Amino acid sequence: MSNIHEHKILILDFGSQYTQLIARRIREIGVYCELWAWDVTEAQIREFAPNGIVLAGGPESVTEDNSPRAPEYVFDAGVPVLGICYGMQTMSEQLGGKVIQGVGEREFGYAQVEVLTDSALLRHIEDGISDAGKPVLDVWMSHGDKVSAIPEGFVAVAKTETCPFAVMANEDKKFYGVQFHPEVTHTRQGKRMLEHFVMDICGCDNKWQPASIIEDAVERIKAQVGDDEVILGLSGGVDSSVTAMLLHRAIGERLTCVFVDNGLLRLNEAKQVLEMFGDHFGLNIVHVDAENRFLEALKGENDPEAKRKIIGRVFVEIFDEEASKCVNAKWLAQGTIYPDVIESAGSATGKAHVIKSHHNVGGLPDDMELGLVEPLRELFKDEVRKIGLELGLPYDMLYRHPFPGPGLGVRVLGEVKKEYCDLLRRADAIFIEELHRADLYNKVSQAFTVFLPVRSVGVMGDGRKYDWVVSLRAVETIDFMTAHWAHLPYDFLGRVSNRIINEVDGISRVVYDISGKPPATIEWE
């Protein structure tokens, strides 16, 4: 078996919103990489032994005292270094160059970079030719400060009209700096530049592939758990589903999946999960029908945060009860993925700044005394999906729109009742079915229906009816940090509204949410 971690890149994070994107692009190239905070120690870098180092961007100014710096060892480690935006500026400053604050000459957005001289980083890459006959690149800039003098041993490789050192290089030491962001799609040839750095300059092979990742994960699970039994909370979501499939491949019958039906799932979702994992794939599943228990606990509660906590608490209680029945289980599996690890500062270095605590299963009791198995903890979400496909999970399940952990508990506004959930399930199923039929489902990033606890007068035949209101919500987004409401065709919305009102007895009005994020959030609660 080839060692998928043999070749690896270290990315040092200075706080840019794009840093995780760099890691994802390098992984897409087929090379393993890890993301660490900028204040990592020399010993930690030596232990990781990267083939190359990327200094990522950041929001601060190199010209200010106490702004972050790369560890000096980065430039003494004997491996290639690529500085991106702030990373280029701190590289320049630390190696004897000069950085000045941009006054009235900030570059944000598209820019054209003219290549001045040959470099291993940009070789054979161009988007056009300048009037002077030089290669031109279309890139994405986002900087105020700029390098005004490059360090000794470096040459200016490319420039823009306002930035004389858009790319700099020391080919002997294999140090490179780019003022733009090659990791974003707006830089048209950005992925090729990263390929040049990772494959050609750092000498990495593309060993990081779905089939190899699965093989490695299976072997690691076997080595970790030995002959022991493992339990897993299976929700039917992407992460827990792929975790279940990896564990099943590794240890077979020694995996017990606990599927808790909280009564807050989508239409027929529990049935589909049980049929797919139990009947089709042959996993050992304990099915707990806990709808009444969850609804009883939620009775009378209107506050969204309180509802989330109740749902999490009841899940933990039930899971704990079921886990205690698995007397031979020594391990608890979780679908923790790499962004969770980064956010929780749970990486091997312990150096990432804590953003939020992450509890994949809602914070399981400390006294469970089970070891933790997290086979996805090195993977980004897009990698988890690719592995799921390789393991035989259906595309539609892996690429389904996001669904909140508390489920319909936060899509029924206010108090959660069975009647409301049943109406919402049917209305939402119609909306999603019509999106698929109109080939719109994959053109929006997320779509769902919200139940509003208000009644509205309607007319049905010769009579009046006084029934509930639902809102349709569809958004377009790249990262879910910001989002635009989706401009779905009027005739499509009309068709969905007519179907819901005619087919779901109890709903008299359908509205469409046209709020962006910000100021609104994507979910209503």
UniProtKB/Swiss-Prot annotation:
Q: Superkingdom, according to UniProt?
A: Bacteria
Which residues does the Swiss-Prot or TrEMBL record annotate as the active site? C85 (nucleophile), H181, E183
EC number assigned by the record: 6.3.5.2
> What are the GO cellular component annotations?
cytosol
A GO MF term? ATP binding
Query: Does the keyword field hold Ligase?
Result: yes
Q: Which UniProt keywords apply?
A: ATP-binding, Glutamine amidotransferase, GMP biosynthesis, Ligase, Nucleotide-binding, Purine biosynthesis
Where is the Glutamine amidotransferase type-1 domain positioned along the sequence?
A: 8-207
**Entries under InterPro entries matching the protein:** Class_I_gatase-like, GATASE, GMP_synth_C, GMP_synth_GATase, GMP_synthase, GMPS_ATP_PPase_dom, NAD/GMP_synthase, Rossmann-like_a/b/a_fold
Q: Which PANTHER family match?
A: GMP SYNTHASE [GLUTAMINE-HYDROLYZING] (PTHR11922:SF2), GMP SYNTHASE-RELATED (PTHR11922)
SUBUNIT field:
Homodimer.
Under which name does UniProt file this protein?
GMP synthase [glutamine-hydrolyzing]
* Organism of this sequence: Shewanella amazonensis (strain ATCC BAA-1098 / SB2B)
Provide the organism lineage as a comma list. Bacteria, Pseudomonadati, Pseudomonadota, Gammaproteobacteria, Alteromonadales
